[in-house]
Amino acid sequence: TVQYLLKRTLPQGGLAPGDFVLWHAAAGGVGLIACQWARALGLRLIATAGGPEKCRLALAHGAEHAIDYRAENFVARVREFTGGAGVKVVYDSVGKDTFEGSLDCLAPLGLMASFGNSSGPVPPVAPALLASKGSLHLTRATLFTHIATRAATQAMADELFAVVASGWVRISID
């Protein structure tokens, strides 16, 4: 999941070292891999998590900043961390509860990458909303599109195993 999001689900012009991204639910299994891989790519990952312990976990795995969404306004904190500029991409597995706020975290021309709906599905979106918030882009990424061919699946797996073998990403199984 992290491979196809960080390497294939990208804003206009891609991502470069120093770019800010926001990752919701960053203290889960996928999120902790994302924190590490983003750091390896030189990205400045802002994590959201539920509670101080989960925020510390995201920071320990490479997030530059962590926001306790239960106690803090994540939109205000993202704007603070980015000097008001916003992030290039929001990676969101939460869905309904974070969708509108996530759009407000994006820089103009930013990408909202929805890949889950743990809080429920996002309601229908009027395209004019994306225009009014800065000509934003929206995608609903799914693994099956990215592994449609054996060659694509192998290339993605090779990249994952390489980043794990390099030591940049450590996968914990509890």
Task: Name every feature range the model reports, one short phrase each.
Residues 31, 55, 75, 99-100, ...:
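Short, well-ordered alpha-helical microsegments
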Residues 59, 79, 130-131:
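Alpha4-beta5-alpha5 "output face"
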